[in-house]
Amino acid sequence: MKILQICYKPPFPATDGGAMGMNSLTEGLLNMGHSVKVLAFHSKKHPCNIATMPKDYIERTSFETVFVDLDIKLIPAMEAFLLGESYHVKRFISTAMKTKIAEILKREEFDIIQMESIFLTPYLPLVRSLSKAKVVLRSPNVENKIWKRTYKATKNPFKRYYLKHLSLTLANYEKQKVNDYDAIFPVTETDAEYFVENGCRRLCKAVAVGMDTPEILPDVLEEENTIFHIGSMNWFPNVQGIKWFLDECWRSVKAASPQVKAYFAGRNMPGWLLNYDEKDVHIVGEVDDSIRFMTSKQIMVVPLLSGSGIRIKIIEAMSIGKTVIATTIAAEGLMYEDGKNILIADTPKEFADAVKKCLEDPAYAKEIGKCAARLIATKYNTDNIAKEISRYYKELLEA
């Protein structure tokens, strides 16, 4: 098959969860012998320098990128607010991207055009006018669910009202446009059920994100009595979750396990976190090698209060045998068993109890990690995921 993959941000280098999810599918489809061309947006938030990318990747994917200014602008935001339109979607409308898509589709024919976000839907009419390919939405999450959970956790009444507006306009947009695609492939069963319950009449199947276990782990000692979090801090649910953890959970965790130290890694750390000053809390910032960082620490904590889709950093940590303590929302979409391959904690006391149990009983924690690694190896193998979605693509083309 010949596939055009259109991405809302650069899938390579795969340094954050979203990029890892897109890139793993690219690699899996290429491994199967399919032809995959990658076209991606890049922005100030998600920059891309082709000159620094591996030549092999560029050649295999015929990689191209288009800049889009995603900075929030007051007047367009107010216009969208007054017109009841989704400002999230409007920010991704780009004349340069329209020109690039038209150029590609006039030059090449594709069997499948894979859109990596609902935010790319404004380009669907153009794609339909220039291509006979089946057009599918690979949905990493249900965007409006993220904002719904976010506004419900927001105390400022004005901010809460505006975030609610963003959530509702995005929900309406998703419901209106989802049937314009030939098929929808969310990454979780939860999201697939949401689309069907909200009117999706197209083929809608959950296809997980692939993650291969590294053959060789970094030669680094695991620091005892440590917990860690790693994630992009330009994603609001991560910021919200870490603030809640430090404000509401850390004292309970520290009281239960006085010896524990916490490490927080990720790009674009906000100023308040960089200036956070408390004993045994270490703000690491961006790391060059996420696997090396995770290998050097003991237990991952993922205290998300909002979000949708699947947390790829959890899958990455599980793949190397790390014990993960996460909220129910953070673990949403994973095929987990609480107490077997992950530990679920939704309150400060539950986090404190789980951390204490793992630190006091390392063998227990190690067993959780081993079971987690087995889960990822069997259920989230990159090539198996690519085979699954390829089977659905074949069905679409033969229908």
Task: For the regions a language model picked out, list residue spans one by one.
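Donor nucleotide-sugar binding/catalytic pocket of nucleotide-sugar-dependent glycosyltransferases
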Residues: 134, 164-167, 171-216
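Acceptor-binding helix/loop patch of EC 2.4 sugar-transfer enzymes
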Residues: 8, 75-90, 135-172, 232
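Conserved acidic donor-binding segment of nucleotide-sugar-dependent glycosyltransferases
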Residues: 342-349, 357-363
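Acidic donor-binding loop of glycosyltransferase active sites
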Residues: 182, 295-309, 320-323
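Short hydrophobic beta-strand element within catalytic cores of glycosyltransferases
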Residues: 313-316, 323-327
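Conserved catalytic-core segment of nucleotide-activated headgroup transferases in glycan assembly
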Residues: 206-296
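N-terminal subdomain of nucleotide-sugar transferases
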Residues: 1-64, 108, 252
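A short, well-ordered alpha-helix in the C-terminal region of glycosyltransferases
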Residues: 364-379, 385-391
